[in-house]
Amino acid sequence: MATKKAGGSSRNGRDSAGRRLGVKKADGQYVIPGNIIVRQRGTKIHPGVNVGIGKDHTIFALTSGRVEFLTKRDHKIVNVTEIASA
């Protein structure tokens, strides 16, 4: 009698969906108040002028203007520079 013992079940085979983190508005892009600029875990990029930060470290625009990424000392900073009205 040819029989085979039942194989054990694998404990692998799961994965979680990606969290959709990263830069949402590029350097020089126009934003309006409330636009999300960066989604991140921790403050990899710090908020600068006219930029707010949420409790999950999301960086968002407080005013209309152009996005500007800078590096000051060891920190990456994002600002929103207002465009002068004509």
UniProtKB/Swiss-Prot annotation:
<dbReference type="InterPro" id="IPR018261">
    <property type="entry name" value="Ribosomal_bL27_CS"/>
</dbReference>
<protein>
    <recommendedName>
        <fullName>Large ribosomal subunit protein bL27</fullName>
    </recommendedName>
</protein>
<feature type="region of interest" description="Disordered">
    <location>
        <begin position="1"/>
        <end position="22"/>
    </location>
</feature>
<dbReference type="GO" id="GO:1990904">
    <property type="term" value="C:ribonucleoprotein complex"/>
</dbReference>
<keyword id="KW-0689">Ribosomal protein</keyword>
<keyword id="KW-0687">Ribonucleoprotein</keyword>
<dbReference type="GO" id="GO:0003735">
    <property type="term" value="F:structural constituent of ribosome"/>
</dbReference>
<comment type="similarity">
    <text>Belongs to the bacterial ribosomal protein bL27 family.</text>
</comment>
<dbReference type="InterPro" id="IPR001684">
    <property type="entry name" value="Ribosomal_bL27"/>
</dbReference>
<dbReference type="Pfam" id="PF01016">
    <property type="entry name" value="Ribosomal_L27"/>
</dbReference>
<dbReference type="GO" id="GO:0006412">
    <property type="term" value="P:translation"/>
</dbReference>
<dbReference type="GO" id="GO:0005840">
    <property type="term" value="C:ribosome"/>
</dbReference>
